[in-house]
């Protein structure tokens, strides 16, 4: 049985490939665009059966000439995740139409289809639950994900021939994101800032939040991969699911976890947030005028639906997850 992973050389895709490998699954077709060649490193430690360029893959899908038999599932992680990319033509072709064509093919072939949606569909909302009236995307990236989610909702009413699951990823961090540049996680940037300068910068107070007190639902990519495989194990489950921890944590906590993990590797003791600030290992910079009124101070996934689907595992909190991530970066990137 063959499994197809799109975006396989990317951040979440390569972690799904790795998680499949840990189960002994290696009959994997890795689909990606390696124009950004350094992404190959994410696949180098994985076992796959074949690599296929994204453009050739979608051509074969559209012409119904893929040569693989007995495809067990498609994990579709290939998309443009740059929220600052405002090229609507590219975004809708790459994120919406590509995904729609894959859905149609998987439904024709009765193949389970697990795809990446995004918490960006909620825009600046304060309630993050999988309900249409709460979804107000603010950019074309969020809209491309939102629009496809609406397709799934309609298809579910009409009846599906095979499982389809969309995961609304919140703030994912972890290994194999180094190619993402400015779109890499805050944990990634904090690590490199601390290693280069010896301190981490955070935004100061704004819009009722104190210094560094803005919060996000930070979720480890290890948990993201586990949940993808949980639904792979349960083909009777379809729908759209938030994929966060259900816990909102401050940027202060993330910065402290990163700095303390680096200090631990240097043989130094853990410091409290107060001590880190007093020693100027965490510094606060004025909140940028350009972001005032546009910056989201809080996100937190409502994971009620995920729990109702039977997923019982606990998530890494920021301290534990970032500690594991920093150890990986020190071993692989430093």
UniProtKB/Swiss-Prot annotation:
Q: Write out the residues that bind NADP(+).
A: 11-12, 32-33, 39, 54, 77-81, 94, 145, 172, 180
Q: For binding substrate, which residues are annotated in this chain's numbering?
A: 171, 182, 189, 203-206, 216, 295
CDD domains per record: ADP_GME_SDR_e (cd05248)
One family name in Pfam for this protein: Epimerase
Identify the pathway: Nucleotide-sugar biosynthesis; ADP-L-glycero-beta-D-manno-heptose biosynthesis; ADP-L-glycero-beta-D-manno-heptose from D-glycero-beta-D-manno-heptose 7-phosphate: step 4/4; Bacterial outer membrane biogenesis; LOS core biosynthesis
What molecular function terms (GO) are annotated for this protein? ADP-glyceromanno-heptose 6-epimerase activity; NADP binding
- The answer to whether keyword Isomerase applies is yes
- The UniProt entry annotates the active site at 141 (proton acceptor), 180 (proton acceptor)
Source organism superkingdom: Bacteria
- Keyword annotations of the record: Carbohydrate metabolism, Isomerase, NADP
Which portions of this protein are annotated as coiled-coil regions? none
Q: What is its EC number?
A: 5.1.3.20
- GO BP term, example: ADP-L-glycero-beta-D-manno-heptose biosynthetic process
Q: What is known of its domains?
A: Contains a large N-terminal NADP-binding domain, and a smaller C-terminal substrate-binding domain.
Protein role: Catalyzes the interconversion between ADP-D-glycero-beta-D-manno-heptose and ADP-L-glycero-beta-D-manno-heptose via an epimerization at carbon 6 of the heptose.
Family membership, please give it: Belongs to the NAD(P)-dependent epimerase/dehydratase family. HldD subfamily.
Q: How does this chain assemble?
A: Homopentamer.
Q: What is this protein called?
A: ADP-L-glycero-D-manno-heptose-6-epimerase
């Amino acid at each position: 049985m063959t499994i197809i992973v799109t975006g396989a050389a990317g951040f979440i895709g390569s972690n799904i490939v790795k998680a499949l490998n840990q189960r002994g699954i290696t009959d994997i077709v890795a689909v990606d665009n390696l124009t950004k060649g350094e992404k190959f490193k994410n696949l180098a430690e994985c076992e796959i059966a074949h690599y296929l360029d994204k453009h050739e893959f979608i051509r074969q899908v559209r012409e119904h000439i893929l040569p693989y038999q007995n495809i067990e599932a498609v994990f579709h992680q290939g998309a443009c995740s740059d929220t600052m990319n405002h090229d609507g033509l590219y975004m809708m072709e790459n994120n919406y139409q590509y995904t729609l064509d894959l859905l149609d093919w998987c439904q024709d072939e009765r193949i389970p289809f697990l795809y990446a949606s995004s918490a960006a569909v909620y825009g600046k909302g304060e309630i993050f639950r999988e309900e249409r009236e709460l979804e107000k995307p603010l950019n074309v990236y969020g809209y491309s994900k939102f629009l496809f989610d609406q397709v799934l909702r309609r298809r579910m009413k009409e009846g599906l021939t095979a499982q389809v699951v969309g995961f609304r990823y919140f703030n994912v961090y972890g290994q194999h994101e180094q190619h993402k540049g400015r779109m890499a996680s805050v944990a990634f940037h904090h690590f490199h800032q601390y290693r280069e300068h010896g301190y981490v910068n955070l935004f100061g107070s704004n819009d009722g939040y104190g210094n560094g007190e803005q919060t996000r639902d930070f979720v480890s990519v290890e948990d993201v991969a586990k949940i993808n495989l949980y639904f792979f194990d349960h083909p009777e489950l379809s729908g759209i699911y938030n994929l966060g921890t259900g816990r909102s944590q401050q940027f202060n906590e993330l910065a402290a976890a990163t700095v303390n993990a680096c200090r631990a590797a240097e043989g130094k003791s853990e410091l409290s947030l107060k001590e880190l600030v007093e020693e100027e290992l965490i510094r606060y910079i004025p909140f940028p005028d350009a972001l005032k009124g546009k910056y989201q101070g809080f996100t937190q996934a409502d994971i009620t639906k995920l729990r109702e689907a039977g997923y019982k595992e606990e998530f890494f909190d920021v301290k534990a997850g970032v500690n594991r991530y920093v150890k990986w970066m020190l071993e692989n990137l430093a």
